[in-house]
Amino acid sequence: MKTQRADYSLKVTNYNKDRNNYHCEVKLPIKLGWFYNVKLLIDDGNSISYRNLSHKKNEGDYAIFEGDVTLETSAIYRYCFSYDVDGRTYYFNANGLQNDSFLSDDCFKLSVNFEVPKWAQGKIMYHIFVDRFNKSNDNKLQEMPRRVIHDNWNEEMHLGPEKETSKIYGKEIWNIDFYGGNLKGITEKLDYIKSLGVSILYLSPIVHSQSNHRYDTADYENVDPYAGCNKDLKVLCDEAHKRGMKVVLDAVFNHTGNDSKYFDEYKSFDGEGAYNNPMSKYSNFYKRHYEKGKIYYDYWWGFENLPECDCESKEWQEYITGVGGVIDKWFDLGIDGLRLDVADELSDDFIEKIRIAVKRNKVDGFIMGEVWKNPMRMGRGYISSGKCMDTVMNYPLIDALLRYYKYADCNKLDYIIRDILREYPEETINSLMNFTSTHDISRAINYFTDENEFTEYAEWAWDLKNNDLNYLKNKKLSKEEYEKAKEKYKSYLFALYFLPGNVSVFYGDEVGVDGYGNLLNRKTYPWGMEDKDLLEYFKKLGKDRNNELFLETAGLKLRDINSDYFSYERIGPKDKMLVITNRSGKEGRILIPPEYNDEKTKIYTLNKSTKDIITPYGAIAIKKAC
């Protein structure tokens, strides 16, 4: 890693990866005077230490100081160097030359023992809710207990509990209406997905489950019959790999379903589940407590269809991560990585074992976690230990971006971006999941309407004022509302596509699928009724992003965030790019830095913006050599 400011340069080189040995070289201009006490200062998060650097030689007008340091612990280190001259101490950090005290937040950052697979950095991801994406013609669904089958792909989904089924079982049973989207259906559409520039396919859970979302696992070892079979997963992975795409599977290891072979509340399986048999071989899989001599099982957030697993249980860990266990079986079928559901509720020890199992199968296996807050500040080793996950879903950034584009909240966006740059490992930043939307929040297009359905000062930008499903069901966008929202949406997408991380497109966002809140956001993909204009825009963004390979790992520098414009730079070893987006409906004049005004630039635009004029909801990206 080399950093240079004017006459100063600092280079830190990892010359022995196995031992984490680093060599530090500092170049200082001789004209400044007689240097002494040249030191490298290192903050490991717990304490600040220093290494004396020795004068090795003079090279032209520079004095060269060098030294070696061993960083044994996986951590994010912050460092700078200092020197004394004429009786004063100077610090050289990320902000340039300072003559005041050492401040860790201003230091350069060095991530030790953090390696994310190259294929998972700076790519485009496609997130599929399997039941709602595409149904192959041969998928004839057979009736099964506690399942409802739709006759028509385009008919409305069921909202709320299924009345008849709930009555039979004496409790509310939701999300059991199926359209039949399946793995073969996805395989049939791989060329379409590839046309969006996608190289990572992220599938919602596919294993046997009672519900259509399949976060209530019934059998980890077999694909749900409505989604296909294990062979179909193998074929999908093989065909995806032929097209240069990797496959990431949603992994739900925090809880199972109550209607599963492990819990088996309804005796749907062999009756040997933990619910009816305290001596079951599965009973140690679950969290439980005793009251008056009776066993009571714990349920995830009180949902009675989701008994909570005991992540500290050796039996449970072995079943999932042991040799020949669940993870091994999935990787045998060809997957390339996992997204850990509710990762913040899994123990670090369990996640470490998951990582060992993943890497046992594929050295470049990828692990992404569902963590909603800054993972570096939760007192956990999700990322910082270097032994758990590679990256997380980027809820903080998406929340801040949405607030900026809807409410002009400049401060939040500035704070979150600087927070991420300061605290996350570089390769984690490059692989963050920057999503258009997900199965848990409203569709992106809804957010950009003038409708006042969202709460500006809620915890999250997508929090709704009214969560009543019947109310939200009737909130349909008019053509005029949709087109106006699409203008803003495009500007937002332009900014999103050029930022660090993986852009994740939730199926249907590229063609204008709408829906407020959880459930209504899970409509079927509208084959034959797509918004072709929006689709072409997504294809163009994907092509533009993939054309600039340096963006996969380029750094990020904020330029300006004001009530109209958001601008930033991406800076790589050989190329850099200036990005400016207009969140307002006003045309404006912009002042481009001189270095971006030469003839040797490449330009990407939205709404015919130029280097002089940025159009309403327009944008421009200018790439040049460094």
Name each model-derived stretch.
Residues 130-200, 206-333, 354-360, 377-378:
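Substrate-binding/active-site clefts of carbohydrate-active enzymes
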Residues 1-127, 135:
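Glycan-association/targeting regions that enable binding to alpha-glucans and other polysaccharides
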Residues 124, 608-626:
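C-terminal beta-strand-rich structural cap/linker in extracellular carbohydrate-active enzymes
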Residues 125-127, 200-204, 248-249, 338-339, ...:
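Structural recognition of the beta-strand scaffold that forms the well-ordered cores
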Residues 128, 193, 203, 220, ...:
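Conserved, mostly hydrophobic/aromatic
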Residues 13, 559-595:
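Carbohydrate-binding surface patches
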Residues 237-246, 254-255, 260-271, 326-328, ...:
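Active-site-proximal helices and loops of the catalytic beta/alpha 8
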Residues 131, 382, 434-468, 472, ...:
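Aromatic/acidic polysaccharide-binding cleft in carbohydrate-active enzymes
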